[in-house]
Amino acid sequence: SHRYCIGAALARGSSELHHVLDSRDLECTRAILCAAGARMEPLPGEEGGWRVTGMDGRPRGGTDTPLSCDVHESGTTCRLLTAVLAAGHGLFRIHGAPRMHERPIDELTRALEALGTEVRFEQRPDCPPLLLRAAGLDPARNGGRVRLGMDASSQYFSGLLLAAPLAPAPLCVELGGQKAVSWPYVGLTLHCLEDFGIRFRVETREPGGPWQALPDGGWRALRTARPDG
């Protein structure tokens, strides 16, 4: 459900989502997406139904004052939206409950810095709360590719997958590490990309498996979608 809410929020136009899970984590994701420019309204008489009007562009942060992005205790919201917001413009402050401020996120932020995002950690190194100064992801800064370890979380990769269609050029992500944590969830992300008409290519090479996005105009609105979970 997180992925489809994000896709619909990034799309141009209006989408309808059905059977969206009802949870505090999803509430956090929706609230941040709306604060960044999307509009989400419950469908009358339908539990889990939402009409989503996209941002018509990129996530919009603050200019002088950062946009507050409170993830509470949702690690999924934190990891997916840190990448997505980095593809936007402006200042974003990502923070949450105390336990979230003990979870490192540096594997992802290193990749975002390589793509042009300024990251500043406010307290503990490599953990939220953190400040993003975003000007859109720029694959050309790093030769069109970044390397990402999969040992800690597959959601770093999913976040980049969701953010990549907003980039002005194809992005290749070279996957590394000794193991891939929760790889089936990457499959959910790829399925979401397919539903929204985003093309991609997966190649397997030793020792890692690069992935390349082929943006064809970015996110497009869906008339209707039913998230897998």
Question: How should these model regions be labeled?
Answer:
Residues 1-229:
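Structural preference for solvent-exposed beta-strand-turn elements
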